Amino acid sequence: EVDPNGLRVWGENGRLHIQTPVMDTACIVTFEGRLYRNLSLPVGETITSIPQGSYIIYVGNQSYKIRF
């Protein structure tokens, strides 16, 4: 998914990709509401491995649903 501000979040081959134009923080939460991980995001693209499942990724005031 792409946000008008240049933020992009997507999943591919068991990896979560987050591309952001500014430093930010991402919060990865399972659909059951459990916190999986917090990530500090530098400017540019961040890639992290993530187990199969469904997640809600919060970055800034946006949320994205990702399924692996």
Please place each PLM-identified region on the residue numbering.
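C-terminal outer-membrane/trafficking sorting elements
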Residues: 1-68
